[in-house]
């Protein structure tokens, strides 16, 4: 922590491939710190973080981060079209893959309601879409990356109950 104390103590967590888990705790209980240890946004000062049985420090940093997609509460959309924003997940994704990811993230319905659909412009920071729409687009972008590990860090806080079913 900022005061020199450990943010996490006595955490022992094993997640199997294909498993979905939720980590629940009070505000300030280091949930975000825990998930940010996986792609090494922070390094553990004690103990170890293993992915696939290998310490994350032993992975090539770029390879590790390419295998992880994180959708945060405050994600960023860039000025450009919806397609431009989705391509940040996978620059080589086909239109079909992008539409499938948006359907999975429950973004396709609202995209289809826009006059230019997937070619609709997004203002810098996504100021012309709602918070829930922005988060769904960010989830779709993360899904396009086809990550080995997908982390949703409070990323559904602005979406409605339909999206909570994700």
Predicted regions and their residues:
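ABC-type nucleotide-binding domain
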Residues: 1-166
């Amino acid at each position: 922590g900022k005061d020199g104390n450990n943010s996490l103590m006595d955490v022992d967590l094993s997640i199997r491939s294909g498993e979905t888990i939720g980590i629940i705790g009070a505000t300030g209980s280091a949930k975000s710190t825990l998930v940010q240890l996986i792609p090494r946004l922070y390094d553990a000062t004690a103990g170890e973080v293993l992915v696939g049985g290998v310490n994350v420090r032993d992975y090539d940093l770029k390879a590790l981060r390419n295998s992880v997609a994180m959708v945060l509460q405050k994600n960023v959309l860039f000025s450009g079209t919806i397609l431009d924003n989705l391509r940040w997940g996978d620059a080589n994704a086909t239109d079909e893959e992008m539409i499938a990811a948006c359907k999975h993230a429950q973004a396709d319905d609202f995209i289809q309601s826009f006059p230019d659909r997937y070619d609709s412009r997004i203002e810098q920071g996504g100021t012309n879409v709602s918070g829930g729409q922005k988060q769904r687009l960010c989830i779709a972008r993360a899904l396009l990356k086809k990550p080995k590990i997908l982390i949703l860090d409070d990323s559904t806080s602005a979406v409605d109950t339909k999206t909570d079913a994700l």
